[in-house]
């Protein structure tokens, strides 16, 4: 199978209806979901007061979203392959709206956690959207469209911080969630009206046992990573969760290999192009998130520390915003490079650009414009990598497995960001400096995290070098040749 995608209209056949609106609608949906993930950042420090709970308890408002997203992303991808990607996209957007309403109505901890968990269930929107593109767009348009949808993750994250800070500064904090609900309704209606349903279906029975096993293993793993610093990395709880994750995921893997219709086809996942791309995704995810962990903190620390810039949260968000716009602007460039040289080369170039951006930031971190420049360079690299990874995945899996495969790749990136958060937390907690009666993360600690981001990007580059290279022209021809057979299979399974 190929990344070119098998919905090119044949001579004498009309193109699918409404495809001109598909890309902007799916990009908007991706932006709305990524905005949701940054909503609570401006009010994290005030949540204990708002919800009448301790800081450790209110941290679950973030952890619940992470865990729900980890479980929902692969599950929704598989359900999309089976029952319709547009249908599961609508379900995901509905979960975002419901979760936003629940959080918007909450004044205590439990409803907030429930609402944030429901919001996390929408995280499969971007991989589902990319999978829809494969089914609906002709091959020549797929690369740029995929890069744009992938970039929507960065755009939403970069624009979400200043937007959320602006809302939190001028309105009641519940307005953050009502804004999310309103945007979710708009995106849901646009998807319902303008995005066609794919005919590519696998049918069959859903692997409920496999979903439960994967969910259990992922929850144990991510819970240990995200809460290990609070509980202690050597505590029985943390070590027990890591051990449970290893045992559960190994057992899950053996089970999936013996099931006729597994949640994740591990034989497909073990193909070199898929496996190596997913490994590179973990490293790239680590590299991407390091920027988000360091730059806002450095911008907001008091100038009296000697290295902080004393900016407000809103100003810090505005500094980060251009990086998201750079990601979107370079999406077509990423697609052109992939078409000319292949997505493997695009991924490697992107990883090098990310590493260069971090190297630049290690040297330049004393002026606001230094951070604007560094974040834009890093954003450019992320735009290249995030456009290339789905193309590599789709180039190696059947169209009937696109949703599950893209969702697994998204999950790998999320694991990378979770590990980055944990590692940065440890580094910044250990490398502190005294500021009055407070211990603040020191300048050397921030430089170390930036250097780790560069190192992770270079590791991603090295891993990507081992991805088997397949000529783009051959892949495109192969996909077009297989399109009729796949569409027949999809129609038959639907019937």
State what each model feature region is:
Residues 19-36, 40-42, 55, 59-64, ...:
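12-transmembrane solute porter fold
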Residues 46, 74-78, 82, 166, ...:
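Membrane-interface helix termini in secondary transporters
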Residues 50-52, 84, 105-110, 171-172, ...:
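Helix-breaking motifs and short loop linkers at transmembrane-helix boundaries and internal kinks
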Residues 71-107:
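Conserved MFS/SLC helix-loop-helix module at the cytosolic interface between two early adjacent transmembrane helices
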Residues 95, 99-102, 110-118, 369-377:
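Paired small-residue
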Residues 118-151:
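Cytoplasmic helix-loop-helix junction between adjacent transmembrane helices
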Residues 156-189, 206-215, 221-242:
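Helix-loop-helix hairpin linking two adjacent transmembrane segments in secondary transporters
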Residues 181-200, 215-227, 244-259, 460-468:
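C-terminal membrane-cytosol helix-exit motif in multi-pass small-molecule transporters
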